[in-house]
Regions:
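Beta-rich catalytic cores
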Residues: 53
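A short, highly charged nucleic-acid-interacting micro-segment common to nuclease
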Residues: 2-32, 47-50
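Active-site beta-strand-loop-beta-strand hairpin of nuclease catalytic cores
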Residues: 39-41, 49, 58-71, 76-79, ...
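Acidic, proline/glycine-rich low-complexity IDRs
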Residues: 2, 9-12, 246-262
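Catalytic cores of nucleic-acid endonucleases
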Residues: 14-21, 31, 39, 71-235, ...
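Rossmann-fold NAD(P)-dependent oxidoreductase module
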Residues: 36
Length: 262
């Protein structure tokens, strides 16, 4: 089907100089934590790297011959997960091209997984009604002038308002469901510690992730990447703020991994 692909990179945050999200963001944190745990005698698999089938950290405990998976976050970015919408010019609806370069980043893969389970693309098409209001961004050609692009940007900002699809702890719970579908029930955030997602199958006694955030939301919006160069995207993103500190932290004392529930 004919498509207009949004080739804009994914950026962490707004403002005049947002930083592009790198393909290997957080990889050094994976390496450092794996090294630390191995030095402490834990059996840990090699880093996941680009292997999306593996968790960031996979540990085999001494008390059972079964891998325990952990998601690792070096930081809570401005957008926990995000992905730019593309546009299907035959059906005149927003869509997602999973094969484009930006879709291969972890922030995008997480967002796509949540989008599919939550129906975010359907919600975006229902809210924005692109069949009636064709996004000006996707009518531009490669030869469009800067003035034409600026006019299109201004028009899209006027016609496509933001919408929040989940607030409170609901978005954080969607994050938990996504990782649970990958058999991952724990998330370690640098500087915050370890949290369980959905349930605590190992009985570590750490706090629940979705109960430890002050606010979370799923948002569809236009994100301006550069006003001066008229670069923007139609975006879906999960924002998580105010994560409290956990009583458990893999970066500090990880001995609780040896005797869970005790």
């Amino acid at each position: 089907m004919p498509k207009k692909i949004d080739t804009e990179p994914l950026y962490d945050g707004d403002g005049p100089s947002p930083q592009e999200i790198k393909m290997n963001a957080g990889f050094q944190y994976e390496l450092d934590l794996i090294k630390k745990l191995r030095e402490e005698g834990f059996t840990v698999s090699d880093p996941a790297g680009a292997d999306s089938a593996k968790a960031d950290l996979e540990l085999t405990p001494t008390y059972k011959n079964q891998i325990i998976k952990f998601e690792l976050k070096e930081k809570l970015s401005a957008d926990f997960a995000q992905m730019n919408f593309d546009f299907d010019t035959s059906s005149m609806q927003f869509t997602i091209d999973k094969n484009k370069a930006s879709a291969q980043k972890e922030a995008a893969k997480t967002m796509i997984g949540i989008a599919e389970s939550y129906g975010i693309i359907r919600e975006a098409n229902s809210h924005w009604q692109p069949q009636k209001n064709i996004p000006a961004k996707f009518t531009l050609s490669s030869s469009s002038s800067l003035d034409q692009r600026k006019a299109a940007h201004k028009l899209d900002l006027k016609r496509f308002p933001d919408k929040f699809l989940a607030k409170g702890s609901a978005a954080a719970q969607e994050v938990e469901k996504y990782y649970n579908s990958k058999n991952t029930y724990y998330i370690q955030v640098k500087g915050k510690g370890l949290f369980y997602m959905g349930r605590d199958p190992e009985g570590y006694g750490c706090p629940r992730f979705s109960s430890s955030v002050r606010e979370s939301s799923i948002r569809i919006r236009i994100k301006t990447n550069s006003s001066s160069n008229a670069r923007w995207s139609f975006l879906m993103a999960i924002k998580i703020t105010g994560l409290g500190k956990s009583s458990h932290d893999l970066d500090k004392d990880a001995n609780f991994l040896l005797k869970p529930g005790l």
